[in-house]
């Protein structure tokens, strides 16, 4: 019971404990997915485009939840096309384009890379 309460608190779902999954908002369902994933006590969590379909304010709320999960000593590998969602929370950013690694490193330096700006962000494309 205590572990369930802790997971619900960590994922921001404590007030929804008795709500059916089908009655949850998209953000709440994403949080439920996270709660189910961390219930087994993983050391690593793989998130595959979890921000998809969310508005920017919802993405910020989701980031807060993911940051709470990280504070539980769970490493997170986050695959995402919405790069701005990652910038404030990742320690390392790897950009892959059609299976080829384009850059790997500190998020700020990766985003400033001319190749990344051209290929991924569409800046400077002729």
Predicted regions and their residues:
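Catalytic Walker B motif of ABC-type/P-loop ATPase nucleotide-binding domains
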Residues: 45-48
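Conserved ABC nucleotide-binding domain
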Residues: 7-28
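A short, surface-exposed alpha-helical micro-motif characterized by mixed small hydrophobic
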Residues: 86-88
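Conserved catalytic motifs of ABC-family nucleotide-binding domains
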Residues: 41
